[in-house]
């Protein structure tokens, strides 16, 4: 997982996003009417809050709103009333009516978001491509970090979206579940959070499970070794568990094993003596460090961290 935050200022992103909504007055009127009809929710919002304001709440405010909204509805102990409230706000914050607009906004480089691989697993490229007619084909799902079904108020909030692959976005993996079970956890481990440190606090590790296999033969097959994780912050195990990253990365051992076998059996001095290339050039040819970095090749964090251990 990696952070997905615009390189633009929050002010610029918010302004550009709101410019895509042309019927703000009508939107705000419907929202005000719904709040009047749902006094249970009114207390969750600062006085004078307009419906359009929620579309640009920063992620920490969205987390507060999401958890407070769900607690308020759960405390009602009235399923019929909960459904009534949810239905009112779902009709206003209708994601299906704005789905393509949101995906186009996220994929527009002018808005400062970089989309290359699924932010949850980094196993699949979701960048898309340009069709022959010049139109951009978008291959990613705009996933709600905070579920729109259980809190419709966050359904259109631009700081609640990340690009994901279908596998991560749908059940039985993430589906409608939030990342983390508390406000603190969700703020810490979500890709929309500036405090997310998955890249530094979680490392892929190489476990040798069969020490009888000779070193130079170990990575010829997928037997005798596995990919696992180590944590500086144990909170991130929730991410690894939710997206079944251990199982999914081990399913890719053939890919990683080719590079591990190559490095394990590499005699760089012999290559240099019999080549016109420098050591750095040989390593680049064999392991594509710079090329993969430039191309944002999927699975690269795992590949590099495993190679460091061989």
Provide a role label for each language-model segment:
Residues 1-105:
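N-terminal accessory alpha/beta regions
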Residues 106-139, 165-167:
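Short cysteine-rich loop/turn motifs with clustered Cys
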Residues 160-171:
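Aromatic- and glycine-enriched beta-alpha-beta binding-site module
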Residues 102-114, 153-158:
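Short, flexible, mixed-charge glycine/proline-rich loop motifs
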Residues 125-160, 174-178, 184-188, 192:
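Histidine-centered nuclease catalytic patch
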Residues 152, 171-237:
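Domain-level detector of nuclease and nuclease-like folds
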Residues 2-37, 77, 219-310:
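C-terminal, charged low-complexity interaction regions
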């Amino acid at each position: 997982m990696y952070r997905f935050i615009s390189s633009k200022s929050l002010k610029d992103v918010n302004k550009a996003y709101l410019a895509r909504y042309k019927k703000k007055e009508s939107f705000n009127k419907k929202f005000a009417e719904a709040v009047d009809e749902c006094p249970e929710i009114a207390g969750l919002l600062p006085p004078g809050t307009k419906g359009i304001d929620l579309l640009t709440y920063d992620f920490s405010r969205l987390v507060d709103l999401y958890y407070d909204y769900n607690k308020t509805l759960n405390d009602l102990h009235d399923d019929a009333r909960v459904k009534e409230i949810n239905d009112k706000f779902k009709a206003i914050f209708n994601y299906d009516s704005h789905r393509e607009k949101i995906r186009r906004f996220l994929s527009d480089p002018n808005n400062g978001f970089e989309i290359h691989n699924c932010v949850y697993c980094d196993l699949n490229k979701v960048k898309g491509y340009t069709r022959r007619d010049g139109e951009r084909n978008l291959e990613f799902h705009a996933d709600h970090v905070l579920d729109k079904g259980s809190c419709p108020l966050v359904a259109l909030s631009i700081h609640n979206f990340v690009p994901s692959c279908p596998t991560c976005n749908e059940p039985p993996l993430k589906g409608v579940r939030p990342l983390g079970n508390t406000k603190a956890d969700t703020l810490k481990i979500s890709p929309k959070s500036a405090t997310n440190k998955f890249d530094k606090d979680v490392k892929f590790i190489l476990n040798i499970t069969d020490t009888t296999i000779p070193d130079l033969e170990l990575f010829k097959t997928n037997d005798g070794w596995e990919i696992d994780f180590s944590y500086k912050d144990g909170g991130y195990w929730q991410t690894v568990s939710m997206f079944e990253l251990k199982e999914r990365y081990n399913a890719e051992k053939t890919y990683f094993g080719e590079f591990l076998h190559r490095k394990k059996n590499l005699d760089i001095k012999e290559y240099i003596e019999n080549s016109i290339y420098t050591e750095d050039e040989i390593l680049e040819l064999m392991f594509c460090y710079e090329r993969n970095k430039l191309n944002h090749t999927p699975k690269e964090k795992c590949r590099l961290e495993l190679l460091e251990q061989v």
